[in-house]
């Protein structure tokens, strides 16, 4: 995948979650709840502060993160793969 996010943006691939109903039926597609966990595929150089310095991001490529899929999240298809482009502020935690 040849993409480089700018500034404090992060490219995340959503991790698939297998959802099971109360009766034990495996739900897929639109019936399944979308995961808010993903793997970081690429990161920008960092946030530019008011004094002009760049603050590096806390996440790195390969981290599994929990994210908030809010207003600023952009869905894109790159090399046939759906990815999310979001700001570091939309990341809530690093798993593991």
Curated annotation (Swiss-Prot):
Keyword presence, tRNA processing: no
Keywords: Chaperone, Cytoplasm
Classification via SMART domains: Cpn10
GO cellular component: cytoplasm
Gene Ontology MF annotations: ATP binding; metal ion binding; protein folding chaperone; protein-folding chaperone binding; unfolded protein binding
Cysteine pairings via disulfide bonds: none
A Pfam family annotated for this UniProt entry: Cpn10
Location(s), subcellular: Cytoplasm
PROSITE patterns for this protein: CHAPERONINS_CPN10 (PS00681)
UniProt GO BP: chaperone cofactor-dependent protein refolding
Function as written in the Swiss-Prot or TrEMBL entry: Together with the chaperonin GroEL, plays an essential role in assisting protein folding. The GroEL-GroES system forms a nano-cage that allows encapsulation of the non-native substrate proteins and provides a physical environment optimized to promote and accelerate protein folding. GroES binds to the apical surface of the GroEL ring, thereby capping the opening of the GroEL channel.
Family (UniProt): Belongs to the GroES chaperonin family.
This protein's name: Co-chaperonin GroES
Organism: Shewanella oneidensis (strain ATCC 700550 / JCM 31522 / CIP 106686 / LMG 19005 / NCIMB 14063 / MR-1)
Taxonomic placement: Bacteria, Pseudomonadati, Pseudomonadota, Gammaproteobacteria, Alteromonadales
């Amino acid at each position: 995948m040849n993409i480089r996010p700018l500034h404090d943006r992060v490219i995340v691939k959503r991790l698939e979650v297998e959802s099971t109903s109360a009766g034990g039926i495996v739900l897929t597609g639109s019936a399944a709840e979308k995961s808010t966990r993903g793997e970081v595929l690429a990161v920008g150089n960092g946030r530019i502060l008011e004094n002009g310095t760049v603050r590096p991001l806390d996440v790195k490529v390969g981290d599994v993160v929990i994210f908030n899929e809010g207003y600023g999240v952009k869905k894109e298809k790159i090399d046939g793969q759906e990815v999310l482009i979001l700001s570091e502020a939309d990341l809530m935690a690093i798993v593991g």
